[in-house]
Swiss-Prot record:
PROSITE patterns reported for this sequence: PDZ
Domain of life of the source: Eukaryota
SMART domains named in the record: PDZ
Keyword annotations of the record: Chemotaxis, Cytokine, Cytoplasm, Nucleus, Phosphoprotein, Repeat, Secreted, Transcription, Transcription regulation
GO MF, any single term: CD4 receptor binding
Gene name tied to this protein: IL16
Region (Disordered): 34-136, 162-267, 316-337
Coiled coil: none
Stated name of the protein: Pro-interleukin-16
Region spans: Interaction with PPP1R12A, PPP1R12B and PPP1R12C: 401-497
Composition-biased stretches (Polar residues): 318-337
Domain PDZ: 407-492, 529-614
Length: 627
């Protein structure tokens, strides 16, 4: 067509004001004046879509008359007015979209639209279009574009269902949801993550996918929103057993893993590195007995018989912390006269393997009942007992004789109470063997009677002390405060093998000995009590070491003595002395800053200090020695 008359819409010799030019632009003038020609042009150049006078709103994507409204804006040579206020971003994008879509007036329609049985009308209603504004055109364009997308989706779905391709997941991007089961075995098409959640659920719809009453098509009228699949028995039957097996696999393995969560031979890897093979076997057997007894006390169902157990725990605890154990200590029938605990000599295990019906009492355990050995053995499960019997049978006579000196002591106590003894030695000290440093007079160990000073401690609550450092051993001893039961395996050392108990530079006494201010004189170290005068300048000495120091966790020691101080004149303290207690406060585990805060908080006057000095004689206040 000829659009030459479009360029004469405005007289270039007549000046029009800016306001009028903005209100009545050439685009709008040409739009209103020549718009009645557009329906005729579209009808004459259409592709057989005439005969729709019902005024159906056109789809602007395939309309042929739309570009003719905006084309003169690009090709006209009229003078343009000054710039006006910028239009919003959405307005410019919408106009640009209209121009891009209208660049080719004779472009072919979409392939999806060409197969529609009833094509949509492309006729423009003349009067309505003339009266419409640009914003109305934009809103109608967005509305028609969205409705056309829905029609396209519906058409694709109908074509795929009619061609027999509905077995594949159709409309994956359309986000179909399942409003309800359409058939007894119908499986809806969902997103991949939703399909994985539906299949392993074991629902009757998934298990009966081969039922002949499956609905193969959704109800009419709801086709775009509901999509179902015909039954495909083979993939479902293949997926469902695999999902079921995967879900049931961990469940079946959990009991065995929980049953073995407390290893029987926990310290076996450590014992294999020992130089003496016989000693290694003794450590292994004692550690097995200790861990097996502690495990049985924590998890009673693993024992052989409920009725033979000496005490029934109410709560289980993890094998590492052992902090939540709660048992009926007063109900134990194995204690004789008191419920503090009992001990078992490992020689009774040997006699039990030989077929004796009654266990033999320990040589130094006259306080224990004759049934204590049988009671402890009854705590072990059949597998643990069988393994112990096999290991005992493999021992030679010399090693079997050493079993007489190994005792398993079970203490019943209150929660949070100490065991009544302290430890000495460690792998990081000269004395490599962990031994009992002291048994407190009124403690549980003293009341039970089996644990003596100088005995080697093999394990506490199933945790082997072989090869551990001194601090680690003290940590294991402190952890034993939490449970209401404690299983300690000790060995009575012969005089030839008794190590030097006080060769360590670290404190071996526990916090329960804080009130003890007596002098403990031994071969190399001396613990004594001194009294110093606290003045405004302090106690007259400086400290070094402490927890978290540059050299690591070290004991608090005296670094140097200040000149002119009372401590220098009296010579009661010397550099290198370790401070154990200060004014009744234990100094173990404190940093140097915390120790100085304690000293600053003391009032002026005499202060009692317990120190440990490496010397043969004590230079402090004399007191009775502790054997």
């Amino acid at each position: 067509m000829d659009y030459s008359f479009d360029t004469t819409a405005e007289d270039p010799w007549v000046r029009i004001s800016d306001c009028i030019k903005n209100l009545f632009s050439p685009i709008m003038t040409e739009n209103h004046s020549h718009m009645p020609l557009q329906p005729n042009v579209s009808l004459s150049e259409g592709d057989g879509t005439q005969g729709h006078p019902d005024g159906t709103p056109p789809k602007l994507e395939t309309a042929n008359g739309t570009p003719k409204v905006y084309r003169p804006a690009d090709s006209s040579t009229v003078k343009k007015g000054p710039p006006v206020a910028p239009k919003p971003a959405w307005f410019r994008q919408s106009l640009k979209g209209l121009r891009n879509r209208a660049s080719d007036p004779r472009r072919l329609p979409d392939p999806a639209l060409s197969v529609q049985p009833v094509p949509a009308s492309r006729e423009h209603p003349g009067p309505h279009t003339q009266a419409s504004s640009i914003k109305q055109r934009i809103s109608s364009f967005e509305t028609f574009g969205s409705s056309q997308r829905l029609d396209k989706g519906a058409q694709r779905l109908s074509l795929q269902l009619s061609s027999g391709e509905a077995a594949k997941p159709v409309g994956k991007h359309e986000g179909g949801r399942l409003p309800g089961l359409l058939g007894r075995g119908a499986v809806p098409t969902l997103a991949p993550q939703e399909t994985e959640q539906v299949l392993p659920s074991g629902s009757p719809a998934a298990s009966e996918a081969t039922d002949p009453g499956v609905s193969e098509s959704p109800p009419p009228g709801r086709q775009p929103s509901e999509k179902t699949l015909p039954p495909s028995p083979d993939p479902l039957l293949r997926l469902l057993p695999t999902q079921t097996e995967e879900s049931q696999g961990p469940v079946l393995k959990m009991p065995s893993q929980r049953a073995r969560s407390f290893p029987l031979t926990r310290s076996q890897s450590c014992e294999t590195k020992l130089l003496d093979e016989k000693t290694s076997k003794l450590y292994s057997i004692s550690s097995q007995v200790s861990s097996a007894v502690m495990k049985s006390l924590l998890c009673l169902p693993s024992s052989i018989s409920w009725g033979q157990a000496p005490c029934i725990p109410k709560e289980g605890a993890s094998p590492t912390s052992l902090s939540n154990e709660d048992s009926a200590a007063n109900g134990c029938a194995e204690t004789s006269g008191s419920d503090t605990g009992f001990s078992l000599n490992l020689s009774e295990l040997r006699e039990y393997t030989e077929g004796l019906t009654e266990a033999k009492e320990a040589d130094d355990g006259d306080h224990s009942s004759p049934q204590s050995g049988q009671s402890v053995i009854s705590l072990l499960s059949s597998e643990e007992l069988k393994q112990l019997i096999e290991e005992v049978k493999d021992l030679d006579e010399a090693t079997l004789k050493q079993l007489d000196s190994i005792h398993v002591t079970i203490l019943h106590k209150e929660e949070g109470a100490g065991l009544g003894f302290s430890l000495a030695g460690g792998a990081d000290l000269e004395n490599k063997v962990i031994t009992v440093h002291r048994v407190f007079p009124n403690g549980l160990a003293s009341q039970e009677g089996t644990i003596q000073k100088g005995n080697e401690v093999l394990s506490i609550n199933g945790k082997s002390l072989k090869g551990t450092t001194h601090n680690d051993a003290l940590a294991i001893l402190r952890q034993a405060r939490e449970p209401r039961q404690a299983v300690i395996v000790t060995r009575k050392l012969t005089p030839e093998t008794v190590p030097d108990l006080n060769s360590s530079t670290d404190s071996a006494a526990s916090a329960s000995a804080a009130s003890d201010v007596s002098v403990d004189s031994t071969a190399e170290a001396t613990v004594c009590t001194v009294t110093l005068e606290k003045m405004s300048g302090g106690l007259g000495f400086s400290l070094e070491g402490g927890k978290g120091s540059l050299q690591g966790d070290k004991p608090l020691t005296i670094n140097r003595i200040f000149k002119g101080a009372a401590s220098e004149q009296s010579e009661t303290v010397q550099p290198g002395d370790e401070i154990l207690h200060l004014a009744g406060t234990a100094m173990q585990g404190l940093t140097r800053f915390e120790a100085w805060n304690i000293i600053k908080a003391l009032p002026d006057g005499p202060v009692t200090i317990v120190i440990k000095r490496k010397s043969m004689q004590s230079k402090g206040t004399s007191a009775a020695g502790d054997s």
